[in-house]
Amino acid sequence: METSLYLPIVLIVGGIIFLILFFHYVPFFLWLSAKVSGVNISLIQLFLMRIRNVPPYIIVPGMIEAHKAGLKNITRDELEAHYLAGGHVEKVVHALVSASKANIELSFQMATAIDLAGRDVFEAVQMSVNPKVIDTPPVTAVAKDGIQLIAKARVTVRASIKQLVGGAGEDTILARVGEGIVSSIGSSENHKSVLENPDSISKLVLRKGLDAGTAFEILSIDIADIDIGKNIGAALQIDQANADKNIAQAKAEERRAMAVASEQEMKAKAQEARAKVIEAEAEVPKAMAEAFRSGNLGIMDYYRMKNIEADTSMRENIAKPTTGGTTNQPLSK
């Protein structure tokens, strides 16, 4: 009695679990949607996708979209292989459909290669149809007259599908355009000619073929704004003048130091000579005493020498100016 009571409950629970597992591993409604859309795929293939960890809700909608767009050569195996390789199936299918509608030549192999290279293949197709405008950051350059100019440009580019794999990106385009603007302004004779004809910059930059080796084709380069910056030439001249002044001051200080050193050296030599004179004068009394003892100097000779010294001292005193600004007058006889 109890077994017959629990049996329906077990069957119901088991049936619910079976249906959950069935619809999880076998997406019946997705298979039905594919059949209605004309995509040939079986329930066994959907079940095997689950076993291979390939989500059917990504592969089947892509197959339906490609089939509706007339791209019937795209197979389920190709989409599965691209997903397992780490690609974006939805973006690849969207890109192929957009390229087909826009008459852009794009194969499935090329689209998957672009996607696996890290590029947004759908955005690339959109850029091929609708060119993209890139605003450059302010580019600073100096004309030959020393005036600094700050320019901003707008670069219109179109994606080159064939160059997306291995081609340089937007940063390279911006760097090359900035280099071209700097070169064009730097070769101008003065800043006025640049302000009068800003299109000359665009023409010169376009002639350089800056899009070589990139994933884009440059359609146009337009100078959006040009501002006048600093007078770099005048600033450099001022800096040079200050440097020359500092050099001259340093040389003058060096000469002054040498002159002071030379003066001190001469004073030292004078002190040395004075010391020698004093030393020699100290020897005079000794020599006179020796002359007296040897009889070479008489008393009259000694007094005559003293008179000469006194006369010399008197003449020196007369020749010296007084503190009041007048000279000493000679004594009246």
Swiss-Prot record:
Keywords: Cell membrane, Membrane, Transmembrane, Transmembrane helix. Pfam families: FloA. It is found in: Cell membrane; Membrane raft. Its main location: membrane. It is a single-pass membrane protein. The keyword RNA-binding does not apply. Signal peptide: none annotated. Coiled coil: none annotated. It comes from the Bacteria. The chain crosses the membrane at residues 9-29. The keyword Cell membrane applies. One of its GO terms (cellular component) is membrane raft. Belongs to the flotillin-like FloA family. HAMAP family: FloA (MF_01562). Homooligomerizes. Found in functional membrane microdomains (FMM) that may be equivalent to eukaryotic membrane rafts. FMMs are highly dynamic and increase in number as cells age. Flotillins are thought to be important factors in membrane fluidity. This is Flotillin-like protein FloA. The gene is floA.
